[in-house]
Amino acid sequence: MKQDSRFPNLFITDHPLIQHKLTHMRDKDTSTRTFRELLREITLLMGYEITRNLPITTKRVETPLVAVDAPVIAGKKLAIVPVLRAGIGMSDGLLDLVPSARVGHIGVYRAEDHRPVEYLVRLPDLEDRIFILCDPMVATGYSAVHAVDVLKRRNVPAANIMFVALVAAPEGVQVFQDAHPDVKLFVASLDSHLNEHAYIVPGLGDAGDRLFGTKN
């Protein structure tokens, strides 16, 4: 994992397998089915990185031979919250890794000025829970900021929030950092820039359309 000196809260997971799979996702000729499978696989691989610092305690267990104090995740419970709609494609990968996690949903769409409009919030109980927000793209950054706002307004501490995306534009990362410098943002790639239509370049295209096989 590496960082960019411009963005202290940004962490880039540069594992070769992740980069290999991301290249195939970028390919405009990749089928909907393959795109969906790759999104799930990359999210699973990124999950290992973003959960590496979860607090650990010990639990007494009986093996077939002896009793031993073995490591387990301490206390806090996990919740996966995809930002609809494209974030749904990432939640399965994280659930493969942590099948006991609760799942919430935050629904937003982009208005003509690219600002997020909220239409749905469904969350599990908040107490002592670590939230992993997921959305394949951080383009303008407004939807990501809004998703974190939803949790902070409900008194979820910043230390209990992580945001994971596949690709991000520097413009969006700056917006996210300005709004939430205390929340970690994990991505597989920091791309070049946003174009005049607020699409990430080189990016993936419209992740939701490619994931579900729809046309914008």
Swiss-Prot record:
It catalyses: UMP + diphosphate = 5-phospho-alpha-D-ribose 1-diphosphate + uracil. InterPro entries: PRibTrfase_dom, PRTase-like, Upp_B, UPRTase/APRTase, Ura_phspho_trans. SUPFAM superfamilies: PRTase-like (SSF53271). 5-phospho-alpha-D-ribose 1-diphosphate binds at R85, R110, D135, P136, M137, V138, A139, T140, G141, Y142, S143, D206. Gene3D superfamilies: 3.40.50.2020. Keywords: Allosteric enzyme, Glycosyltransferase, GTP-binding, Magnesium, Nucleotide-binding, Transferase. Its EC number is 2.4.2.9. The keyword Nucleotide-binding applies. It holds the Pfam family UPRTase. Binds 1 Mg(2+) ion per subunit. The magnesium is bound as Mg-PRPP. Allosterically activated by GTP. It is an enzyme of class 2 (transferase). Coiled coil: none annotated. Its cofactor is Mg(2+). Pathway: Pyrimidine metabolism; UMP biosynthesis via salvage pathway; UMP from uracil: step 1/1. Uracil binds at I200, G205, D206, A207. GO terms for molecular function: GTP binding; magnesium ion binding; uracil phosphoribosyltransferase activity. GO terms for biological process: UMP salvage; uracil salvage. Catalyzes the conversion of uracil and 5-phospho-alpha-D-ribose 1-diphosphate (PRPP) to UMP and diphosphate. Belongs to the UPRTase family. This is Uracil phosphoribosyltransferase. The gene is upp.
